[in-house]
Amino acid sequence: MQKWAKTSAATQQFGVLLFDGFSTHCLANTIEPLRAANTLSGKTLYIWEFLTLDGQIAESSSGMQVTPHRELSAAKGDVLAVMPSYGFEGHAGWVTQMALRSASHRFESLAGLDTGSWLFAEAELLDGYQATI
């Protein structure tokens, strides 16, 4: 098997912001490629942590519960992946907007997964950019 990992690449820190109703399928499809890259390279290329707005357990649409490592306000990193999924409209209030705006200064890149781009739009983080929602 060919080794494609960059030897000088810094470990990338991913924060995965979960909301109640998130898709376990979307979560697995986000984390598994990172885990596989680590395994195949024999290096820690990616690390990730699960986040919620309030530090409380998030429950997926299928009933799986995920205990976050910390709340969003205490997190920083390279990529923030926002994963609301079903019922995202219920998460689109000012608390979420302020939290996402604040987090945009602590993360290098933002990724809206599933319906996450809607929350970025509500927080005005897509203003001035072309985006698909």
Residues of each region from the PLM?
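Structural detector of well-ordered beta-strand residues that form the stable sheet scaffold
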Residues: 110-111, 132
